[in-house]
Amino acid sequence: MPTPNISTSAAKGFRRAVSELDSKQAEAIMSPRFIGRRQSLIEDARKEREAAAAATDAAESTETIVFEEKDGRAMLNLFFMLKGVKTSPLSRALKVFETFEAKIHHLETRLSRKPREGTAELEYFVRCEVHSSDLNTFISSIKRVAEDVRTTKEDKFHWFPRKICELDKCHHLVTKFDPDLDLDHPGYSDQVYRQRRKSIAEIAFHYKHGDPIPRVEYTAEETATWKEVYSTLKSLYPTHACKEYLEAFNLLEKFCGYNENNIPQLEEVSRFLKERTGFQLRPVRGLLSARDFLASLAFRVFQCTQYIRHASSPMHSPEPDCCHELLGHVPMLADKTFAQFSQDIGLASLGATDEEIEKLATLYWFTVEFGLCRQNGIVKAYGAGLLSSYGELIHSLSDEPEVRDFDPDAAAVQPCQDQPYQPVYFVSESFSDAKNKLRNYAAHIKRPFSVKYEPYTHSIELLDSPQTICHSLESVRDELHTLINALNVIS
C-alpha cells in the first residue's frame, strides 16, 4: 500500500500526540503499516446504490411497476380510488380486469389516505396477474375509470432474510480487497499466504447455520503476528478504551483464551457472547456486501473472518481479519446496550432502499467502527476500527481531529476519509443516548412496514397490518404482566 500524503501541519499535530512515546514507537506509528482499514462497507453500499440507480434509469417504465414476472405474466400490486356515485364504478373497474384476463390474487378495501372534504372514501388494493405484453394498456385502462392509481413502485422493497437460517443466503462478497486481486494488499505477491487464506476461507464457504464453527490450527507465524498486534494494542487499552470494552476484555482473557500467545477460536467466543447478549458469530469468507452484513446484525449475528493479516504488515489490513474482529468488535458486542444498538442498525436496514443502506453503512462506520463516547467527562474509544488500530486509536484521542456530538442525520452523510486517518469523529454521551437517537432516525426510513425481532424463533416479524401489530402487543402485555407481578412480590 503506498504511503499516504500527510500535510506538514497534520504531521506536526500528530507528532505532538505521540510525543510521550519512545522514538521507536513514534516512528512506527507514522509508518503506513499503522494506517487503519479502508471504508469498504460504505464504498460498497454507494456502488450498490449507484448501480441500482443506473439500472433503473436504463429500464423501461413497465419494469418499475412489476412485482415479479414469470412465464410472460406480470404480478403487480395496484392501488386506486373509484370515480362516480350514481354509476357503478366497481363494476366498470372489474370489467377492465375481465377484458385483460387479469387474475386477481387479493382484493381489499381501505380508508383512503386522501379523503375528499367531508367524505370517508375507500381505496382499493388489488394484487393481480396480467399478461406482460398488456401491462401498459391495462394500467391506462384502469386510470380511465379510477383515480389516484398507484403501483408497487412505491411499495417495492429488497428481499431480506426472515429466518436466521436464511443468513445462509447472505453471502455476497466484495472481492476488491482480496489478496488475489488487490495489488496493494500486503499478501498479493505471497503465494503461500494467498493459498493459506483461501483454505481458511473454505470453512466459511461450507458453513451452514446451526453447525459448530470449525477450529483453525494457526501456524507459528500467524500466532507471532497476533502476538505483536495483541501486545501493542493492549498497552493502550487502559487509557484509551471505554469501560465497557475493558470489562469485556478482562472476561475474554479469563474465559475465552484471549492472550498474546493464542488466537481465540470463534466457536468458544460465540458461546461466550450468546450467554452475555444473545449475539453469536458466524464465519465469513471475506468482506460482505453492506446489505448482507447489516441484515445479519438484525438477528444478532456478527459475520466474522478467521484468517489473519499478512506477517509483513501486522498493524494494517486492507480487509477485515480476525485481529480486527476479535480485538475490535467482540468485546463491545458483549455489552447489552451496545449489542442492542448494533441490532437496531441491522433492523433498520431490512428492506431499505440502496440510498438508505449507504446512509446506514456510514452511520455504522462513524459509530461501531470509529465511534467515541464521553465517560466521566473524558472521551474514550469504543469503535472497532479504533480499538484494532494502534495509530488511529492514538490519533482519535489527540487534539488533531475534529470531534462532534453524535447526530445520526449528520453522521449518515458525513464524508469519510480513511487515508491516513479520520479528520472527524462523533462522540456519544452514552450508548443509551446513541441507541435512542438511532431509533428516532430509523423511524423516518420509508418502508411499507415495520419489523420486530422474535427472539424465541430467531425470526423477523413484519408489522404491516393491524392484525400483526395486535398480535405483537399480546407478547408485550404478557411481559408487562410478569413485571407487575414481580413488583408486587418485592413491594
Curated annotation (Swiss-Prot):
The keyword Secreted does not apply. InterPro entries: ACT-like_dom_sf, ArAA_hydroxylase, ArAA_hydroxylase_Fe/CU_BS, ArAA_hydroxylase_sf, Aro-AA_hydroxylase_C_sf, Aromatic-AA_hydroxylase_C, Eu_TyrOH_cat, TH_ACT. GO terms for cellular component: axon; cytoplasm; perikaryon; perinuclear region of cytoplasm. Pfam families: Biopterin_H, TH_ACT, TOH_N. Gene3D superfamilies: 3.30.70.260, Aromatic amino acid hydroxylase. Its cofactor is Fe(2+). Keywords: Catecholamine biosynthesis, Cell projection, Cytoplasm, Iron, Metal-binding, Monooxygenase, Neurotransmitter biosynthesis, Oxidoreductase, Phosphoprotein. It comes from Phasianidae sp. Phosphorylation leads to an increase in the catalytic activity. It catalyses: (6R)-L-erythro-5,6,7,8-tetrahydrobiopterin + L-tyrosine + O2 = (4aS,6R)-4a-hydroxy-L-erythro-5,6,7,8-tetrahydrobiopterin + L-dopa. This is Tyrosine 3-monooxygenase.
